[in-house]
């Protein structure tokens, strides 16, 4: 099996290596509460539905990764009427910490996974979110493995 050539992207305090044929769009943005954040939007080659969207910035005051994942779920999906013990947000071992997220198919029937994790650098708490999309959920695992192996924070 041949080794895939990687390229390094550095933006907003995140460094990551991805396949060199993939497309990257970066953006800085300000949340309504004034936090400055960075977004890295990565797409595979045309015709390949795999994508990774990373957001990274200071943790919102009074929040944590679980609250952020839950809020995102209910913002995107809404209240399904499920019982509390059927909470769709689950734990992930991600980036050496506990992340929280959920899986949901897209309108195009692609697999989609969203994870929030709290990462710390220089004694500060940061919110790291990752949205991955692929043809199958098994491909999502490969994308998450790639990120975990190739990411670093500044």
Predicted segments with their positions:
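Short, solvent-exposed aromatic-acidic interface loops
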Residues: 57-60, 76, 131-135
């Amino acid at each position: 099996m041949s080794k895939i050539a990687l390229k390094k992207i550095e933006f907003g305090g995140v460094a990551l290596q991805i396949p060199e044929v993939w497309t990257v769009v970066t953006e800085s943005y300000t949340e309504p509460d004034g936090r400055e954040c960075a977004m890295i939007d990565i797409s595979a080659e045309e015709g390949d539905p795999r994508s990774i969207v990373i957001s990274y910035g200071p943790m919102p005051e009074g929040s944590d990764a679980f609250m952020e994942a839950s809020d995102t779920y209910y913002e995107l999906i809404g209240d399904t009427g499920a019982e509390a013990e059927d909470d769709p947000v689950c734990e992930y071992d991600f980036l050496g910490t506990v992340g929280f997220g959920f899986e949901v198919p897209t309108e195009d029937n692609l697999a989609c996974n969203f994870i929030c994790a709290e990462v710390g650098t220089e004694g500060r708490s940061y919110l790291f979110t990752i949205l991955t999309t692929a043809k199958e959920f098994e491909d999502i695992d490969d994308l998450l493995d790639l990120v975990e192996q190739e990411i670093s924070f500044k």
